[in-house]
A protein has these predicted regions:
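Glycoside hydrolase catalytic-domain context in secreted enzymes
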Residues: 1-212
Length: 212
């Protein structure tokens, strides 16, 4: 539900256009239909995502008022009207803080102000990008700690081996215990809401039919 604010942005075709109201209406109707069927939806990319000149993932400097009147409108609607239970963070920075580790965005705005009670998930490799692209931390362990402490619940990396530097952040005590409890709790809460623990075992024949 990102806005197409610059036609030079290479992901413009993924959006509903440049109008916050239209994007909100389309987004709400899309996510609500799935949520009502018991499928968790994850609006993305929270928030803004495209910088000056359509530069994807680049730093963005918008005022809070501008964000409230434009880029945040579709997201707020998806959570409050569409009942989306998850949200994916954006690659970019907002005023010097990566969206994936941004407590103003993920805690103050999303949870405290809007009342969001789902889980937050990073885009693919977005936590690693905190270190590799934005250089706001010294290493991957610090990136993981900044993200979880800043309101992220799920780290999404593209290979299993990439979990190791983020695990080290927990082992070294860089991740606050209450932040870790929140992250784990939000994911478990979503699973309980879906009834996954009521039926913990899948039908192997059914799974084979869909995954063959």
């Amino acid at each position: 539900v990102n806005l197409a604010t610059d036609v030079r942005w290479g992901r413009t075709e993924e959006t509903y256009g440049e109008d916050p109201y239209l994007s909100a209406c389309m987004g709400v109707n899309f996510v609500r239909s799935f949520e009502e069927m018991g499928v968790i939806t994850t609006p993305k990319h929270f928030a803004a995502n495209s910088g000056d000149g359509g530069r994807d993932s680049n730093p963005i400097h918008f005022t809070e008022r501008f964000l409230e009147e434009t880029h945040l409108v579709p997201f707020k609607a998806c959570f409050q009207k569409g009942q989306s239970q998850s949200v994916m963070t954006a690659y970019n920075m907002l005023d010097g803080t990566p969206c994936t580790a941004n407590p103003w965005l993920l805690i103050d705005k999303l949870r405290n102000e809007w009342g969001f009670d789902g889980f937050t998930i990073a885009d693919a490799d977005a936590v690693g990008i905190i270190h590799k692209l934005h250089h706001t931390v010294n290493n991957f362990s610090e990136a993981g700690a900044d993200a979880i402490n800043g309101g992220l619940d799920v780290i999404f990396q593209t290979t299993y081996d990439e979990h190791r530097p983020f695990l080290q952040a927990c082992l070294d005590g860089l991740v606050k215990e209450e932040a870790l409890d929140r992250a784990v709790g939000q994911v478990l809460k979503a699973k309980f809401r879906l009834g996954l623990f009521e039926h913990p075992y899948i039908d192997e024949n059914e799974a084979e039919k869909w995954n063959a």
